[in-house]
Amino acid sequence: MEHFVTLFDSTFLPNGLALHKSLMRTTADFHLWVICMDETTERALTELKLVNLTPIPLATVETPELRSVKGSRSIAEYCWTLTPFSVEFVFERDPNVERVTYVDSDVWFTKSPELILAEMGSAGSLITPHAYSPEHADNIKFGIYCVQFMPFTREGSTQIRRDWQSKCLDWCYAIDEPKRFGDQ
């Protein structure tokens, strides 16, 4: 079974529902974990009782370290800050999960993500650089890596997850600075 985790608030609820639908259409055996960034999202997902989906209330995953930076970040920045922790939340909740893929809530799968995951082989994580077309090359200022689809294994990615978490706790803003932006 493939495990995916995402996070969104009620503004992105339609996107998250579309993500779930695309997984239902393309992936035989999966589970989608959703960190609910507001009570409206938590309530809606709980009431919908979608198969293969577990809503996770934000309050249950916020650590003291995360709460300490929450007030200094916009909602988007706080979501970015949570991203590297989201995989950890799934590993903590289910000790049988061997791999979790973080996926942005606005992703729509047209084919099975297992095709991409097979490329990973025995690697502990799969991190891909943005592939901006020449006419959009200036977007590199918004980050080097494509965060929208990032698989991590439980055992083989501990160090990279910890490093990313630490860096996002330290700095995760929508400010164009040399060599960093948001959760990059």
Regions found by a protein language model. Name each.
Residues 1-184:
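Glycosyltransferase catalytic domains, chiefly GT-A lineage
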